[in-house]
Amino acid sequence: MEDKRIVLAIILSLVVFLGWHSFAEYMGWISPKVQHVANERHSSVDQTATSNIALDSVQSVFSPPTGKDVYIETPLYIAKIHSSGGILSSFILKKYKVNLDNTSPLVNLVSPEASQAMPLGITLNGQPSWSNGNWSFLGGDLYLKPGETKELTFVGIVNGVKIIRIFTFNADSYLIHEKLQLASEKQNSCPTKVGLLVAATPFGTGQYDPTRMAWSIKDSFKEETSIDTLKEKGIQESGEFNWGGVMSNYFMNVVALSDPLYLTIKGRIQNDVWRVALERSNVLIPAEGTTSITVNWWFGPKDRELLSRAPDKLENAIDFGMFSIIAKPLLTALTFFYEYTGNWGVAIIVLTLCIKIVFWPLSQKSYNSMEQMKKLQPMMQKLREKYANDRDTLNREIMQLYKTYKVNPAGGCLPILLQIPVFIGLYQALLNSIELRHATFIYYLPFTHLVWLADLSAADPFYITPLLMGASMFLQQKLTPASGDPTQQKIMMVMPIIFTVMFLNFPAGLVIYWLFNNLLSIGQQWWMLRKA
């Protein structure tokens, strides 16, 4: 019985880990996050609204500056930058669609609404540079072929400070490198506070892919996902930052400064636009001299390979949580299997099989231990009846029973306990992998023209795999040696129902993993029963 209690505690803990957020939203304890992809939004933003970019000193109007648009096209994206201040007007990803429809538009990480918050913009002492000065640019539209890098320079005069923004674009990366030069025409040195802005409308797609504000401070990942908090209070924190911005599981708009510097991050949601600023205070511009700041911007997917080559710890933006040490090798293995199978769903099944093989000896030990515990149940029941009013003696007698028959009461649950971090690691790996976005397993439901498992990052639209998963759990429960406690038996039989309901809206890739893991476990249990 003690063995079953431990197993039950582990399972309930896993249920809480996976299902708490959904339950809390359903009960109304936290507000639901209504997310949309940027291209699907049709809300309007008041162009004369006062900026609440979280740069408290900025109280200027975010109105479109005069000037012209400059286009930059690479094999990866098409960007549009406004010549007045170097403001980003749109950033369209050429390799990613909003949805699976053939007519779907491409993902635009800077929607028309977000562009009103002036992403890629800079402020000096809280004043917007794009509307308080005269700007010109050197060059024209840029078209980059693979392997090429090209530059674009914007020059402005704002309140006696000459701003030179030299952007370098790489055809093979989403990174935009900027050399920001500030030159003073004054006779004395000028301490200046410089703000760097990013903005986005929500490009997350729901509960398992929320849009959030995130930042890296002293190489540690931090984030804020609460819409209520970001609307009412916003965020503000100072420290040695690597980068900060807006992101979902798959995409991000962030700004970074080379080398960790003491900065302040501020962010807020206003009119459904997520605005983040990194502020660097006391930037000293020497008298009649120039100071330079190295800035890196990333507007694009959270691609592990590309981010691993990016500066400023940008690879930390892919956060796998406390089980990253497990999630990363699992994702590497999954990618390896995909290269040979050409199908992410098949790759998940192969990975599941490999994990099952690794844990086969432990699972076998678990089943043996539970079978031994089952044989002891009649003797344990007699002890409970004999010492019903003497719990201390009962516990001593039960422990002596374990010792006599050489049974470890935890032997059945420890192997399960060891597998839970693997499941959570894989959960995080699948949830944060851009490779699985719109990855197909079985496009059409067999014998129909209904789109089925066309996107492993989305839920099964017909709930077929969650129902099969629940049925497999029920069958597995039937094959597992039962506890002598009727109450525990009833609870364990209810678990498949709980998991089925919980998995209805899980990404299909995770459900497939759990389903095939159950099927392999059933096969192992059947083999052991035949062997016995």
Swiss-Prot record:
Disulfide bond positions: none
Location within or outside the cell: Cell membrane
Family: Belongs to the OXA1/ALB3/YidC family. Type 1 subfamily.
Reported function: Required for the insertion and/or proper folding and/or complex formation of integral membrane proteins into the membrane. Involved in integration of membrane proteins that insert both dependently and independently of the Sec translocase complex, as well as at least some lipoproteins. Aids folding of multispanning membrane proteins.
Record-level GO BP terms: protein insertion into membrane; protein transport
Protein source organism: Lawsonia intracellularis (strain PHE/MN1-00)
Regions that span the bilayer: 6-26, 317-337, 342-362, 411-431, 451-473, 496-516
Main location group: membrane
Name the UniProt record assigns to this protein: Membrane protein insertase YidC
